[in-house]
Amino acid sequence: NMKYLAIGNEQWGEFTFERLKFFVEAMRKAHPEIVIIGSSGPDSEGENFDLGWAAMREQGADLVDEHYYRPVDWFQKSMYRYDDYPRTGPKVFAGEYACHDAGKKWNHAGASIYEAAFMTTLERNADIVHMTAYAPLFAHVDGWQWRPDLIWFDNLRVARSTSYYVQQMYARNRGTHVVPLKIPRTPVGEDGLFASATWDAQAEEWIVKVINTSTEALPVHIVLDGVRALAPLAQATTLDCSDYDLDNTVEEPNTILPQQSPIQTAGNAITTTIGGKTFALYRIGAK
């Protein structure tokens, strides 16, 4: 019952593309129902990346696997990466990504908040970004190959990183439809706020994700245009990453955890405050 087939991993170059076409042609003939995933190489931009994408378009790959293990400044500059991607041709599989800081290639809360902010562009552009996957899932504290990773363990204990909770908050609150969202600031993100919004048809709730990458607490006023009234209480889930270098460890696995609290609604809006370096998620029901 295979649905997807990735051909290669971080391959690039003239000979790779010449040989790849024979695999694609054979798979299309034998199993046209299987989604073929090609590669844009190991880079997130540049000549090899552009050549890889051009080859994937020419050969008709369904998805292109992009990888980016990058520092904070790259993520800061890439919050709108997919807004201007072509809407025709192959779609995107963000197959490996993680944020790290200068000299800090381990998990820490400061990197997690930029991953959360970057994921707003993945969610807003769900028409072009069809799948995502974080960096490696498991790592043993005494025998790891690279960092960061989502879950760390030793022979007896396990710790979920702050990056794990970022992924969990998105995965459990995807929604069924992307909702247009306007932030009345120019330029957007200048104050460190990034956001995305979806509608969950099954739960009949709006899901608004707001990430504050600045160090200052900021006011948040969410208005749902065209909605007469909301349920009296919305549910907020927050992940406080303000202790920049901190993370969960096998010795202290519950240092940073998502926290839930109710928020009073008023008409078709909620007004609250988001702390510095915080990922906040609001589930807002219709009345």
Task: Report residues per predicted region.
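C-terminal beta-sandwich/jelly-roll accessory domains of carbohydrate-active enzymes
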Residues: R185-T186, I211-K287
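Surface beta-strand/loop "capping" patches
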Residues: H177-N212, L218
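A glycine-rich phosphate-binding loop feature that marks nucleotide/adenosyl-phosphate handling sites
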Residues: D43, A135-H140, I183-V188
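Catalytic core of soluble alpha/beta enzymes
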Residues: S39-Q59
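Active-site groove signature of glycoside hydrolases
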Residues: N1-T16, A94
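Short, glycine/acidic-rich beta->alpha junctions
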Residues: E18-R19, S44-N48, G110-A116, G189
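Acidic-and-aromatic substrate-binding clefts and catalytic sites of carbohydrate-active enzymes
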Residues: Q11-F17, G41-N48, Y68-S78
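Catalytic-core region of carbohydrate-active enzymes that cleave or remodel glycosidic bonds
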Residues: V24-R28, P32-V35, W53-E58, D62-N173, ...
